């Protein structure tokens, strides 16, 4: 960890927290209808309600809200699945891509609807422009809106008392999309285009290369099978490449909401390491900022809405402390390189001529400082976009993003999902504190009783169950082990990372695992769907239960939930649950890998 790394991380955190304040103020006013923007575009909003047959004045119980949420997203899966299956017969397909397979289309549909954006295909070789714009980009907006409205419903549960409703799902989704996501994405898209991110609908361009490249390609027979000689070795033919095909597309418009909505699915296979998605250090900084700005602002929205800003600041402080620690560990691990290279007298020190450390799988235009920031931000949130190959991180460098996902992505987390996950841990923290002092636990004026704790237990235990059971099945099944490219502990880490990513709706991966198979398509689709909606439903149940409770006044025995003591208690609860749940699995994967480095060095 050098001065440059520290300075870049510090500047980023300061800019993020400073920007979160006005964004939170805007979000609060939009959702309560007091913003001037809502008044200006009110006729458009009301026209949408009339067209859809919705009465915006009618609010929903938590069960109605949950049913609307699940049904809306299930219809999104069906629409996107159908679009990917028939894209070959639709316009907007200059490359003539055919339909995706049944399991591939279903996996992709579930992935984008659940805000995971897990991609086991090469987008620029698989998905048409129409499917990208009408299918994937639309779901990038709607899945992000779903996460935000769920946390808004939970916040209303804390803010209201003796109420039977928590809002109107259709009104919430419309306002979040119309007044928050669309304008913010438009601004970010314009800034990205200024940096060189492309935005067009041209066919792919064939351009001559500056230098002819030659390589040995396998000779194929008439059926396309490799030809072998008498000894069974493949026959090769020398091939020269004088031209290159450059993929085009409407990238900037999708890139903006991909980052802002913590979606993460790339227009290209290289994701945000591709120069057409992320060409400059400034665009990289902007994309990291876009990932975390709404999650950070929502913490302050929580405080504003319940009438005690200190509560939101405390949650934001806990997240920021954890984020800073993760950035420090990640950057130090990558800047330190590996003992194996050090034992070979390779110079790993940073200097004006080199970044030093472990630069494998990283872009030289970003270096270790910005890469470390991106790795932590994308896995602390439920984004999953990458500007480097996570499979090439050091064992400790790979452990950090894996653990951030396994903690439930509550360190800022996805838009909405991060805050409602952290508030669930806050309920668990005050429950534990209540047990220690012998008092009924309270949080922001609401008693936390057995029903809330049952729902908290479901939220806390469901994703670890999906991760560990899914990993176990994949390790035991032949179809699961067949995808491992790197045997040993790293192969296990690849599978553990895949299910941690899917169940927690992140979408990033250790690329050495081949997952475009029916086995992994079905397994990860199940993990993604239940990881998303298996937690949303109990969160909405908590919201409904809290809204119906009376507000109680704080007394001398009430645990303060706005000071440093609560921040420490909250972080301790998050880390303890994660450590106890995943430590054995992490020891078998990244833990063993890290120890093997020192064995190799000697």
From Swiss-Prot:
Segments crossing the lipid bilayer: 3-23, 64-84, 135-155, 178-198, 282-302, 313-333, 418-438, 456-476, 522-542, 565-585
Keyword Transport: yes
Lineage of source species: Bacteria, Pseudomonadati, Pseudomonadota, Betaproteobacteria, Burkholderiales
NCBIfam families, per the entry: kdpA (TIGR00680)
Subunit structure: The system is composed of three essential subunits: KdpA, KdpB and KdpC.
Main location: membrane
HAMAP family, A to Z: KdpA
Secretion signal, residue range per the UniProt entry: none
Key word Protein biosynthesis present: no
One Pfam family, short name: KdpA
Subcellular location: Cell inner membrane
UniProt-recorded name of the protein: Potassium-transporting ATPase potassium-binding subunit
Homology family: Belongs to the KdpA family.
Alphabetized UniProt keyword annotations: Cell inner membrane, Cell membrane, Ion transport, Membrane, Potassium, Potassium transport, Transmembrane, Transmembrane helix, Transport
A GO CC term attached to the entry: plasma membrane
UniProt function note: Part of the high-affinity ATP-driven potassium transport (or Kdp) system, which catalyzes the hydrolysis of ATP coupled with the electrogenic transport of potassium into the cytoplasm. This subunit binds the periplasmic potassium ions and delivers the ions to the membrane domain of KdpB through an intramembrane tunnel.
Membrane topology designation: Multi-pass membrane protein
